[in-house]
Amino acid sequence: MSGPVDTAKSITKKRKRKHGGGARAATETDDATTQPVVENGAVTDSPEKGEDTKKSEKNGKDKSTKKRKVSHASSDEENESEGEQGAPSQADGDSDNNGDDGDDNSEAENGDNGDKKDAESTDLPSADALRLPTVEGEPQKFTELGLTEKTLKAINDMGFDTMTEIQRRTIPPLLAGRDVLGAAKTGSGKTLSFLIPAVEMLSALRFKPRNGTGVIVVSPTRELALQIFGVARELCQYHSQTYGIVIGGANRRAEAEKLMKGVNLLIATPGRLLDHLQNTQGFIFKNLKTLVIDEADRILEVGFEDEMRQIVKILPSEERQTMLFSATQTTKVEDLARISLRPGPLYINVDHRKEHSTVEGLEQGYVICEADKRFLLLFSFLKRNLKKKIIVFFSSCNCVKYHAELLNYIDLPVLELHGKQKQQKRTNTFFEFCNAKQGTLICTDVAARGLDIPAVDWIIQFDPPDDPRDYIHRVGRTARGANAKGRSLMFLQPSEVGFLKHLKEARVPVVEFEFPANKIVNVQSQLEKLIGQNYYLNKSAKEGYRSYLQAYASHSLRSVFDVHKLDLVKVAKGFGFSTPPRIDIQLGASLSRDKKQQQQGRRNYGSQPHSKGLKFKRKHDD
């Protein structure tokens, strides 16, 4: 039977299945977009598939019948070798329905000779059989890496030609199978640095859905995981391998179903990944060949150290290549590298020779502003830059919620992004802002790491960053890519100018910006009147005020950001209160725990104090 007929037959079988066939492992919203392309590719002969068919006929024309006779015997051997893993052996039972337990793209990719390839060997080739390109000299372009045509075509579609420094220095050794510990500033192109070798490995080993997961990428935040998933989708568009994502807040059952069908390239956040590793039956990860830990320092900062240790312990270590990327090298990162990387990893740091820790093309400044004038300055700035694309960073979820409600109420539209939102809301907001040509996003540091948001004009740090590293990651949301431009502005109170010394030590160049006093719109009286009359805004403002003080008290640089030096009357005016509201908060106790909770977005703001600590009580009326 000719190849195209077999493909059409398998697709007909797929359509008869109760649930419509195994969709490509991806997010629920991705299935609709990938499936039509797959079906068209399976039914019609594209030029790419025609070449594969000709090669197959040329190399094995006389042996095709013999290979088909062997197919069932090979499948039986596969069933025995798979041991207790039922899902892959069941899919291997009949060469005609290989795709039934896999995905549409797997069939579309193999096209005419897919059944022949499966019949030859259903076992996953060992790492000894892996032949990735060997790169000589100093490659500058992706075409010099010896990548597969499918990968090169995808990279070309993405608009990339010349590699960044981190890509030039990491991709060749990763293709050679080395473990790599990489350090590069944000916006340097790390994502493609680890995805290209991962996809090439999966392709070289001819991973099928029944083989389970071959690559796992661990990301610190859901938004960054979604972004990596988007890049992986573009990179894998011409490959047959499946890809998927598992993140907190998403439908766990749907994720488990896709994992059981087989996800070759998996992007995940640590908590949800550990959950599936421990509890999802049929999740095959015994064939794992590559583990990627992206933004390792951030993963450890937000409290996932225990989860990462368990994940590394659970995953198979034999023949596993590990790629660990971190913007900064801390003691915890070194500990994680020691338990996850094989002996003798390659350490690549592309930043240590740079004069500045931030990217070129980024104009950075600060403005000295009293606490009671901060909102007025922000309001005036946003009003004057309505045609720009701006990100404003705050220190807590409640501060973001209050300012979003206030600005939208007074007809200055903004989007908000923080850790207390439901996952669907966070995802929708993220992509809405990515696709917007102008607008303002106010957010916590949940958006500070790794997110590649196009064409951001301004980064405003309304609340101070925790340390210079956080500053660098915040401003890294602009001036991304080659020759890109961007500007950042940091608000500092007079008591906070000591932070400039820390930035200088971290090789961050900042200059003072001046904002003429006559350009500041004085809406203080209207603001206080609005907060006094609107119950919901008043309640939100009070929560924001409380959260601001708690976040300030848990600052890691308390020698600079000392809560005792704050003028609470001026701070309260910045939140729209004529006099400081009565609040009851706990300051000074369990600061490290509070800090950890703040970074995770799960902080218990406004909790009543039950232990020793510093209390701030104001006996004024609300």
Curated annotation (Swiss-Prot):
Residues binding ATP: A184, K185, T186, G187, S188, G189, K190, T191
InterPro entries noted in UniProt: DDX18/Has1_DEADc, DEAD/DEAH_box_helicase_dom, Helicase_ATP-bd, Helicase_C-like, P-loop_NTPase, RNA-helicase_DEAD-box_CS, RNA_helicase_DEAD_Q_motif, SPB4-like_CTE
Keywords in alphabetical order: ATP-binding, Helicase, Hydrolase, Nucleotide-binding, Nucleus, Ribosome biogenesis, RNA-binding, rRNA processing
Residues of the Helicase C-terminal domain: 361-531
GO molecular function: ATP binding; ATP hydrolysis activity; identical protein binding; RNA binding; RNA helicase activity
Principal location class: nucleus
Residue ranges of the motif Q motif: 140-168
SUPFAM superfamilies assigned to the protein according to its UniProt record, in alphabetical order: P-loop containing nucleoside triphosphate hydrolases (SSF52540)
Signal peptide start and end residues: none
Membrane spanning residue stretches: none
Biased composition (Acidic residues): 93-112
Cellular compartments annotated: Nucleus, Nucleolus
Basic residues: bias regions: 11-21, 612-622
Residues covered by region (Disordered): 1-137, 588-622
Gene Ontology biological process terms from the UniProt entry: maturation of LSU-rRNA from tricistronic rRNA transcript (SSU-rRNA, 5.8S rRNA, LSU-rRNA); maturation of SSU-rRNA from tricistronic rRNA transcript (SSU-rRNA, 5.8S rRNA, LSU-rRNA); snoRNA release from pre-rRNA
Motif stretch (DEAD box): 294-297
RNA-binding as UniProt keyword: yes
Domain Helicase ATP-binding residue range list: 171-347
EC class (word): hydrolase
Domain of life, per lineage: Eukaryota
The keyword Nucleotide-binding is assigned to this record: yes
Biased composition, class Basic and acidic residues, residue ranges: 46-63
Domain statement: The Q motif is unique to and characteristic of the DEAD box family of RNA helicases and controls ATP binding and hydrolysis.
Record-given protein name: ATP-dependent RNA helicase has1
Upper lineage: Eukaryota, Fungi, Dikarya, Ascomycota, Pezizomycotina
